[in-house]
Amino acid sequence: MKRSHYFIAVPLTSEAKQAISRFSGDASSSLPFRTWVHEEDYHITLAFLGDVPPGKMAPLCEAMAAVAAKSAPFSLALAGLGTFGERTAPRIFWQGVKEEAALNELRRDVYEACLSLGFSLDRRPFAPHITIARKWQGEAPFQPEALRSLPAASTVFSVPEIVLYRTNMEKTPKYETIAAFPLLGAPDGRTGEGMGQLLKLRDYISRYETDVYHYVPEFIRLKQWQWEQAKARWEAERDADGARREPGETWDFLLDKPSWWERLIGRWRRGPEPEMDEERSPAPSLSRAATLDELKWQFLDDLFELQGMPAGRL
């Protein structure tokens, strides 16, 4: 059975991808590399994991969510070109980024978290780059000096999240988003910013789609963990601000969350329920996929409730 490879990376914005793609299109006519990377596959690798057994998926996602929760969003600037491999026959042609302390710190935290989970990682020093082409196949040796005359892409882009990708070698583009983790830290070093950060989770929750469904119990536990972390941050900030919590506030309904999650896991494990007429069973029967959709929308509805807004599905 063919195993999938996974990695944690910084994604690029559409604008940054387009800038590199335009450069790539121009450069490919004069630089005979065998493969030019698809625009949607541009990224900055933080940790290459290789295979991720099902039992490690939930701990990995929890660890990445924790790292992201304490990291503040930042910006990067495209700058410079370079190669890896032999000087005259490089195996990688890359676009660089300007030195950024926030990126180095994020990579350090991601790397250490992955090591603590037992992943075997590349020990070489971190060299942030975006691979744009592979394998020199020119008849003449590659001339590094030629890069100086190329009009490299130049733009600044935001980094609001880190992503767990899976490699699909038989597809184009070949890197598939498995989970995205929003950077929720505040610039002053605090973890989270109360409701504003909670609402960010609403914007990202729809990212947890297709392939995470293969690890449904782990996925459900991850959602429970994220909810508990967000709730704890919000309550801590409420307490720090000296706000008085009235009985019956919106947090009260969260006390039943553990039993709700357990019921949902149980329903998923039982599989599709038999069809019944409306008189015998007013509640709709749910397939496993429908139950997972319920999970996603329930999480969204909970966030809407915390805002004091009617529940709604975006």
Curated annotation (Swiss-Prot):
Keywords: Hydrolase. It catalyses: a 3'-end 2',3'-cyclophospho-ribonucleotide-RNA + H2O = a 3'-end 2'-phospho-ribonucleotide-RNA + H(+). The active site is at H43 (proton donor), H129 (proton acceptor). The keyword Metal-binding does not apply. SUPFAM superfamilies: LigT-like (SSF55144). Gene3D superfamilies: Cyclic phosphodiesterase. A motif (HXTX 1) lies at residues 43-46. It holds the Pfam family LigT_PEase. A motif (HXTX 2) lies at residues 129-132. GO terms for molecular function: 2',3'-cyclic-nucleotide 3'-phosphodiesterase activity; RNA 2',3'-cyclic 3'-phosphodiesterase activity. It comes from the Bacteria. Belongs to the 2H phosphoesterase superfamily. ThpR family. Hydrolyzes RNA 2',3'-cyclic phosphodiester to an RNA 2'-phosphomonoester. This is RNA 2',3'-cyclic phosphodiesterase. The lineage of its organism: Bacteria, Bacillati, Bacillota, Bacilli, Bacillales.
